Curated annotation (Swiss-Prot):
Main location (coarse class): periplasm
Gene: torZ
Gene Ontology biological-process annotations: anaerobic respiration
A single MF term (Gene Ontology): electron transfer activity
Disulfide bonds: none
Necessary cofactors: Mo-bis(molybdopterin guanine dinucleotide)
Stored CDD domains: MopB_CT_DMSOR-BSOR-TMAOR (cd02793), MopB_DMSOR-BSOR-TMAOR (cd02769)
Entry EC no(s): 1.7.2.3
Name of the featured protein: Trimethylamine-N-oxide reductase
GO cellular component: outer membrane-bounded periplasmic space
Residues annotated as binding Mo-bis(molybdopterin guanine dinucleotide): S187
Reactions it catalyzes: trimethylamine + 2 Fe(III)-[cytochrome c] + H2O = trimethylamine N-oxide + 2 Fe(II)-[cytochrome c] + 3 H(+)
Maturation and modification: Predicted to be exported by the Tat system. The position of the signal peptide cleavage has not been experimentally proven.
Signal sequence extent: 1-40
Length: 825
C-alpha cells in the first residue's frame, strides 16, 4: 500500500465509515435521528452519550448491544477513533475473568519469575484473586515496608473524574501505608525538568497564546517536530477537537506554515505546508545555525535580550565559537542536520522579518540530551524578540490537547484524589503522592539495580528495592524503551499485579490479572479541552460490565475492605454521589462566574454535553504578555525573574551532559553517527489510528497494517539499496533487539531515516529462549535505547537510535499477540 497519499486514503476511508453517512452525528443527528427515526419494525434502539480521550461519542445500542458509534459533536476533521466502541467492548482480546499465572498460583511470591510472559494461566474466582492480591501486598509491606511496592502505574488509562485507574490505585496504596511512585512522564521527560530552570514553569502543559491572536497577528507558524493532526485527535481528558479547525483557518488565510520534521507528517500534507526535512535528533544544530545567522547579520533583538533574559552573553560566546573554537554557522549546522545552509539563512531572515510563532513538539526532546531542544527553542525565540507579542514567540503545547483554543468561562469539575479523606488536598496528574519516587523512565534500571545511586535535577536518588509491582491502566511493555531489558527487569519483583481490559503485552507479563471495565461500562464525567475547558461531558454507562469485568473503583473498594480501610477509601459515597459532588464543584465555580448550569440531575438526564463560551479576554490572551508589559511587576519564577538563557543553577550542578546554557552534544546514536552495521536512524512518531497502544487491537488496524505488521516508512533510495519493495515484510534490528514490520516505501521520510510508529503491541517469538527474541508485530521500543536524557532530567530517549533493515526471507511467523494466551483447561 502506497503511503504518499496517506491523507487521501484516510479521507476515502472516513467517507465510507463516517456516522454522518450512516445518519448519525449529534449536530447532524446522532442523538436525535437514530432514536427518533427508527422504523417500527426495528427492535428497541437508544443512543447514549459518553466520552473518551478521543472526544464525545454517541453510541447506538440495540437489544442491549452496541451496534454503532461516532461523534456526538461533529469534528472539523473526522475522527475514526470514535467509531470502534463495539470493538473495545466485545473484543476477543479482553480479559474476561480473574486470571493467575500457573506457576505463581502454585507458589505465590516464590515462583519462577522467568516464566512471566510464557506460562499458562489459571482462571480463579474474584474472591480468590482479591485475597491473593491482598495477601501478597500485605506480605511485601510487612517485610519490606512501603518502599517495596511500586504503584506509579504510568499510562493513559481512560479519561474520567472518578474512574481514573492510576489515581484509584494510589488512593488505595496511600490508605494502606504508602508506595513508591515516580517523577515525570514519557511525553515530556526532559522538557518538564529543564523548563522551570529557564522559564520558571513546567511550560509543556500550559495554555498557549490564543489561536484568535495567532490568526490575527502571526505571519508564519512553524511546526517543529509536531504533528497536531495526529496528536490533537486525543486529549488527557477529552479532546475538544477545535485546534485543527484553527490550523485550517490559518491555512485558508494564505499565510505560511512550515513543518520541520524528518517525516512529511499527516499535518504537513493536510495543510499543504512547506516541509523542511531534517535529520533525526539534529534540531539543536539547526536552531544554532539560525541563531548564528541572526547574530552575524545583526538581526537578533538586543533590547529584548537585555531587558527580558539573563545570561545571553555567555551563550553568545558559545554560539560564536569563542569557548570551543567552533562557530555554529549555517554551514556547520547544514553538515549535521541535512538542511542546506542557504535554507537555514533564509529561515533566519524570514523569522526576523515576520511575526513568527515557533510551535515546538515533544518528540525532539525524547532523545539523548533532550533538555537542549526546548531550551534552544526558547533561546531562539528570545533572540527574535517576539515573546509576549500577539502571534509571536514560542509555544510548546499547540499540538497537544488543542492548546491555544481560548479558555472558556464556566466551571471545572472535580475529581477523585490519591489522598483519601482530603489529606494533602487535590493533586494534579503530575503530582506525586508517594513516600518515595524515582524518574519514571528509569523503571527497568530501578528493578534491575536496587540501591544504585543516580543524579536527578541536582539531587542524588537511591533506587528502592521493589518486591511488588501493581499497574492499572498502562502498558509499559509497549511504551518503555529496550523491551528486552524490561523483560529481565520484570523478572526481579516477587509479584506483578495488573488491572487490565485486554490481554496486552503488560498483562501477559504479570502474575495476577484482574479484568477491568472499559469506560463504556460505567458512569463518569469529564471535561472537553484540557486548556479550553469548554464542555462538561457525561460519560454514561452504555452497557453493563461485560464478562466478569469490574470497575477499577470497585476492585480497590474490595481490596480496601480486606485491608480494613473501606470507609476511608470510599468516604461513604456511591458512584453517582461522587459524580454529583464533582459536578457541583463546576456548578459552584460557574455560579461565581455568573454562568448558568443546570442541576446535576437535569444535566445527567439530558444526555448531552454542556458547553461554555470563552470571553473576549481569553480570545486575546497572549502567553508572557504580562511579563513583556512589565517584567518587574510580573517576573518569571526563575532566580533572575527573567528567561534564563544561561542558568547558574544548572551550571552549578556540574553535569557533563547538561551545561549551563543550551548546546549541541552529539549522542552516541543518531543520523550523523551511523555505522556500517547500523546505517539508518530510527524515529518513533505517534500513530494516527491509535492512542499509543490503545485501540491497537481494534478493526482500525486493518487500515494501516502492512502485511499484518506495523508499517515502517522508508525512503525509496534506502529501500532500493536493500531490494525492498512496498508491502514487503522486513526485519529491523539494532544492538538491542529485532522486529518484523511491513515496508511502506515513501518519499515522505528523509533519506537515511526510517519511521516506525510507537504503540504496536510487543509480540515476542520464543520468549525466554533468546536474548533478543524477534517481535513479530513491530514494537518500536524493542529497538530503542533505555538511556536517560541526561543527569538533569533522566527522561526517555528513544529517538537517538540507529538500526539496519533488510527484506525478510522465508515464511513470516504469525502475529499472535491479539489472541488469548494459553490457559489451563
Amino acid at each position: 500500500m502506497k503511503k504518499n497519499n496517506v491523507n487521501e486514503q484516510r479521507r476515502d476511508f472516513l467517507k465510507k465509515t463516517s456516522l454522518g453517512v450512516a445518519g448519525s452525528a449529534l449536530s447532524g443527528g446522532m442523538v436525535g435521528v437514530v432514536s427518533k427515526s427508527a422504523v417500527a419494525k426495528e427492535a428497541e434502539m437508544k443512543t447514549v452519550v459518553t466520552a473518551a480521550h478521543w472526544g464525545s461519542i454517541g453510541v447506538v445500542v440495540q437489544d442491549g448491544k452496541v451496534v454503532k458509534s461516532g461523534p456526538a459533536i461533529e469534528p472539523a476533521v473526522p475522527n475514526e477513533l470514535q467509531t470502534v466502541v463495539a470493538d473495545q467492548l466485545y473484543s476477543e482480546r479482553r480479559v474476561k475473568c480473574p486470571m493467575v499465572r500457573k506457576g505463581f498460583l502454585a507458589n505465590p511470591g516464590k515462583s519462577d519469575t522467568t516464566m512471566r510472559g510464557r506460562d499458562e494461566w489459571v482462571r480463579v474466582s474474584w474472591d480468590e484473586a482479591l485475597d491473593l492480591v491482598h495477601n501478597q501486598l500485605k506480605r511485601v509491606r510487612d517485610e519490606h515496608g512501603s518502599t517495596g511496592i511500586f504503584a506509579g502505574s504510568y499510562g493513559w488509562f481512560s479519561c474520567g473524574s472518578l474512574h481514573a485507574s492510576r489515581t484509584l490505585l494510589q488512593r488505595y496504596m496511600n490508605a494502606t501505608g504508602g508506595f513508591v511512585g515516580h517523577k515525570g512522564d514519557y511525553s515530556t521527560g526532559a522538557a518538564q525538568v529543564i523548563m522551570p530552570h529557564v522559564l520558571g514553569t513546567i511550560e509543556v502543559y500550559e495554555q498557549q497564546t490564543s489561536w484568535e491572536s495567532i490568526l490575527e497577528s502571526s505571519d508564519i507558524i512553524v511546526l517543529w517536530s509536531a504533528n497536531p493532526l495526529t496528536t490533537m485527535r486525543i486529549a488527557w481528558m477529552s479532546t475538544d477537537q477545535k485546534g485543527i479547525e484553527y490550523f485550517k483557518k490559518f491555512q485558508a488565510s494564505g499565510k505560511r506554515i512550515i513543518c520541520i520534521d524528518p517525516q512529511k507528517s499527516e499535518t504537513c500534507q493536510m495543510l499543504n505546508a512547506e516541509w523542511i526535512p531534517v535529520n533525526t535528533a539534529t534540531d539543536v544544530p539547526l536552531m544554532l545555525g539560525i541563531a548564528h545567522t541572526l547574530v552575524e547579520q545583526g538581526k537578533h533583538d538586543k533590547d529584548f535580550l537585555k531587558k527580558y533574559t539573563s545570561g545571553y552573553a555567555k551563550f553568545e560566546e558559545y554560539l560564536l565559537g569563542k569557548t570551543d573554537g567552533q562557530p555554529k554557522t549555517a554551514e556547520w549546522a547544514a553538515k549535521i542536520c541535512g538542511v542546506p545552509a542557504e535554507t537555514i539563512k533564509q529561515l533566519a531572515a524570514d523569522f526576523a522579518s515576520k511575526r513568527t510563532m515557533l510551535m515546538g513538539g515533544w518528540g525532539m526532546q525524547r532523545q539523548r540530551h533532550g533538555e537542549q531542544t526546548h531550551w534552544m527553542l526558547v533561546t531562539l525565540a528570545s533572540m527574535l524578540g517576539q515573546i509576549g507579542l500577539p502571534g509571536g514567540g514560542f509555544g510548546l503545547s499547540y499540538h497537544y490537547s488543542n492548546g491555544g483554543v481560548p479558555t472558556a468561562t464556566g466551571g471545572i469539575i472535580g475529581s477523585i484524589t490519591a489522598s483519601p479523606s482530603g489529606k494533602a488536598g487535590a493533586k494534579t496528574w503530575l503530582d506525586d503522592t508517594s513516600k518515595s519516587a524515582f524518574p519514571l523512565a528509569r523503571i527497568a534500571d530501578v528493578l534491575l539495580h536496587p540501591g544504585k545511586k543516580i543524579q536527578y535535577n541536582g539531587t542524588e536518588i537511591t533506587y528502592p528495592d521493589i518486591k511488588a509491582v501493581y499497574w492499572a491502566g498502562g502498558n509499559p511493555f509497549v511504551h518503555h524503551q529496550d523491551t528486552n531489558t524490561l523483560v529481565k527487569a520484570f523478572q526481579k519483583p516477587d509479584v506483578v499485579i495488573v488491572n487490565e481490559v485486554n490481554w496486552t503485552p503488560t498483562a501477559r507479563m504479570a502474575d495476577i490479572v484482574l479484568p477491568a471495565t472499559t469506560s463504556y461500562e460505567r458512569n463518569d464525567l469529564t471535561m472537553a479541552g484540557d486548556y479550553s475547558m469548554m464542555s462538561v461531558y457525561p460519560m454514561k454507562q452504555v452497557v453493563p460490565p461485560q464478562f466478569e469485568a469490574k470497575n477499577d473503583y470497585d476492585i480497590f473498594v474490595e481490596l480496601a475492605k480486606r485491608a480494613g480501610v473501606e470507609e476511608q477509601y470510599t468516604e461513604g459515597k456511591t458512584e453517582m454521589e461522587w459524580l454529583e459532588e464533582f459536578y457541583n464543584a463546576a456548578f459552584s465555580a460557574a455560579r461565581a462566574n455568573r454562568v448558568a448550569m443546570p442541576r446535576f440531575d437535569k444535566f445527567w438526564a439530558e444526555n448531552k454535553p454542556l458547553s461554555f463560551e470563552a470571553g473576549e479576554a481569553a480570545k486575546k490572551w497572549v502567553r508572557y504578555g504580562e511579563f513583556r508589559e512589565d517584567p518587574l511587576l510580573n517576573p518569571l519564577g526563575t532566580p533572575s525573574g527573567k528567561i534564563e538563557i544561561f542558568s547558574d543553577v544548572v551550571e552549578k550542578m556540574n553535569y557533563n551532559d547538561c551545561k549551563g546554557h543550551p548546546s549541541w552534544m552529539e549522542p552516541e546514536e543518531f543520523a550523523g553517527n551511523v555505522t556500517e552495521e547500523y546505517p539508518l536512524a530510527l524515529v518513533t512518531p505517534h500513530p494516527y489510528y491509535r492512542l499509543h497502544s490503545q485501540l491497537a487491537h481494534t478493526s482500525l488496524r486493518q487500515k494501516y497494517a502492512v502485511n499484518d505488521r506495523e508499517p515502517v516508512m522508508i525512503h525509496p533510495e534506502d529501500a532500493a539499496a536493500r531490494g525492498i519493495k512496498d508491502g514487503d515484510i522486513v526485519r529491523i534490528h539494532s544492538k538491542r533487539g529485532q522486529v518484523l514490520a511491513g515496508a511502506a516505501v515513501t518519499e515522505n521520510i528523509i533519506k537515511g531515516t526510517v519511521a516506525l510508529h510507537e504503540g504496536a503491541w510487543y509480540d515476542p517469538m520464543y520468549l525466554g529462549e533468546s536474548e533478543k527474541p524477534l517481535c513479530k508485530n513491530g514494537c518500536a521500543n524493542v529497538l530503542t535505547r533505555d538511556e536517560g536524557t541526561s543527569k538533569l532530567a533522566q527522561g526517555n530517549s528513544p529517538n537517538t537510535c540507529i538500526v539496519q533493515i533488510e527484506k525478510f526471507i522465508g515464511v513470516a511467523p504469525e502475529v499472535t499477540v491479539f489472541k488469548q494466551p494459553k490457559q489451563v483447561a
